[in-house]
Amino acid sequence: LKEPLDVIKLNPQNFEGSLMRMGGTFLGSNNKGNPFKKIIRNGKKIDSSDLVIEGFKKLEIDALIGIGGDGSLKILQSITKKGNINFVGIPKTIDNDVKHNELSIGYDTAVDVATNALDMLQPTAASHRRVMILEVMGRDAGHIALNAGIAGGADVILIPEIQYSIKSIADHIEKLRSKGRNHALIVVAEAVKKENGKKATVKYVDGEVRLGGIGNYLGDEIYKITDSETRVTVLGHVQRGAQPTHRDRLIASAFGVYAVDLIAKKKFNRVVVWKDRGVQDLMLSQVAGYSKTVQKNDPLIKVAEGLGTVSYTHLTLPTSRSV
């Protein structure tokens, strides 16, 4: 832990109009600094959670507002419980996979970016008679792919919660051809598995293994069957840095006001959520560590079926992995 403590003091100037228009986080925080995770340093294993708690106590802060997804909220639940720290959580993840929460900060913007990407890919797909594949983020939840796929007019939408076959995709492309279409748009979530059941992953130089590569796999397999020229676009971190949509700005503002009100009322260990067109709060234990994937009864699944984005009626949507 740095001494003196490395902090950013919040003041009215931090919250002038420009901040609302920015993507990312000016705090520079992420969920990779899990203090409970054993880190090997000079051959020793270290649990730095006590240092984090000590640093928090030194700052003499009355309460902590934690902003993040299910992973961040789980870490914060553990650290605040151990340190007896007053805590309120706010869901922020483009994956939109926080349990009991309809909309997380960042999600609407990510869907907008993916939709715009499909809008831009369609003309070049038509011009050059290609099958264009767009790989989007979302981890184990298919919310971005499903929503952007419908809004962007994708011909095939693939999400982790739904099993598929390369043959069904190839048949769909051939069907489009028979109707005079010379191109197709496919959107696929990064956690969609290969037909053998394995996830597509990429190993980085630092040894970290992350989701990625399913788009290229699909492109190769589709080409083998249909002889269609395929091109793959991996949208990646573009989804995380765009200018926030009006909906994200509204939700973030509403979450912030509600979280401060909870602290003023001394209601701690709560998470604010967006539900039934407004802000509510739930116990932290109801949310932290759980995920929200696309459900079998999601009305957008029916929309995707009706639009003919591969025949979902012949596929199996397994029971959600969420608790």
Place the predicted regions along the sequence by residue.
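A short beta-alpha structural unit
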Residues: H237-P244
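Accessory alpha-helical/coil subdomains and C-terminal extensions
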Residues: G55, A63-G68, K74-S78, G83, ...
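Active-site histidine-anchored catalytic micro-motif
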Residues: L1-M132, D140, V156, K179
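Conserved small/polar residues in nucleotide/adenosyl-binding loops
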Residues: T313-T319
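A cross-family phosphate/adenosyl-ligand binding-site feature
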Residues: L1-E60, G71, A191-K199, V205-N216, ...
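Flexible loop/turn connectors
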Residues: I251, F255-A264
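Structural motif
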Residues: G24-F26, D62-I65, I85-P91, R130-L134, ...
